Amino acid sequence: MLIAAANKWILYLSQTYEGSVHDKRVADEEDLEFGADDPHRETLELLQDLGFQGYKPKGVVVIQPMKKPKGGELTEEQKTANRQISRQRVVVEHAIGGVKIWRMVKEQIRSWCHQLRDRVMYLACGLHNFRLKCRSHSIRT
């Protein structure tokens, strides 16, 4: 699980989990406190996908697409709202894509050292942030 800012900067990366683990379970285990010392924390928005259904941490406004009801359909207003949320969330998906440009992240890591997965992800996120920083400081002609 990672948290990215609107400028694609990766702010937080959880430890890696082996196998398939539900996003909400990872979020619950991380027990994050958003903006605990920020006086404007009510204005923090957490954009999350449907994998985090039911995850509502304190101190933030949760923005999540509406799930299609079982055997039903979403209204046009709900579909429009979901599209608007997706337009905002695409920044996070681009940040994840920026981390996954590194071959070692894309492929399965076969190692007896379980900490290696975490280290590879930390390094990939650090390189992603470094790349963003270099782009912002580059001289454009």
Identify the residue ranges that each predicted region occupies:
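Short, well-ordered secondary-structure "scaffold" segments embedded in the functional core
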Residues: 1-141
